[in-house]
């Protein structure tokens, strides 16, 4: 095959690995997003799946060229760029109430960030970190609010009883 068409040659082991990483990223983001859909939040499974997939795609984009070997600092800059850009997307999910005191959407913004981070870890092939991060995110999204509410009630009740004793 002529040299200018050599990029069409398939290396199925590498392509299978890339596909596995992209699927892992998409499914990790979708798992977090499904939780958001269940709780009727504005950013859900499709959005977070796409955010995670996009992050993995950016990380993997350099790996398809055998001639290119990225230095650790170059990968670090790509990750920093992803996370900064995702911060702007997450900021769009944060809303203030009419009186300006209530803030809504912070957890949704954080889920956009974790979906991006899961995409980065999947893109890098850090399988344990991708799975552990997905499970931890789901744990926090599922049980975080009830635990937070109980602890808040517990500590505000203790604070109130201490103030009453004074």
Task: Annotate each language-model stretch with its function.
Residues 1-78, 124-125, 130, 150, ...:
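Alpha-helical transmembrane segments and their membrane-interface boundaries
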Residues 3, 7, 117, 135-137:
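Transmembrane helix-bundle core of multi-pass membrane transporters
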Residues 104-114:
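Short hydrophobic alpha-helical membrane-embedded segments
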Residues 106, 128-133:
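Hydrophobic alpha-helical membrane segments of integral membrane proteins
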Residues 56, 60-61, 81-93, 113-126, ...:
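Mid-bilayer segments of alpha-helical transmembrane spans in multi-pass integral membrane proteins
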Residues 136-146:
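Alpha-helical transmembrane segments and their membrane-interface exit regions
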Residues 29-41, 89-102, 146-149:
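C-terminal ends of transmembrane helices
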């Amino acid at each position: 095959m002529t040299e200018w068409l050599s990029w069409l040659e398939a290396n199925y082991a590498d392509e299978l690995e890339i596909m596995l990483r992209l699927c892992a990223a998409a499914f990790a983001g979708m798992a977090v997003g499904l939780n958001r859909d269940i709780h009727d939040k504005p950013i859900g499974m499709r959005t977070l799946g796409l955010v995670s997939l996009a992050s993995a795609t950016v990380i993997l984009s350099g790996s398809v060229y055998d001639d290119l070997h990225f230095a650790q600092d170059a990968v670090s800059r790509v990750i920093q760029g992803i996370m900064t850009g995702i911060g702007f997307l997450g900021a769009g999910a944060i809303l203030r109430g009419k009186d300006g005191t209530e803030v809504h959407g912070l957890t949704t913004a954080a889920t956009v960030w974790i979906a991006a981070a899961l995409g980065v870890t999947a893109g890098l092939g850090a399988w344990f970190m991708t799975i552990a991060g997905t499970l931890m995110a789901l744990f926090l999204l599922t049980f975080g609010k009830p635990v937070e509410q109980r602890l808040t009630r517990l500590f505000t009740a203790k604070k109130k009883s201490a103030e009453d004793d004074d």
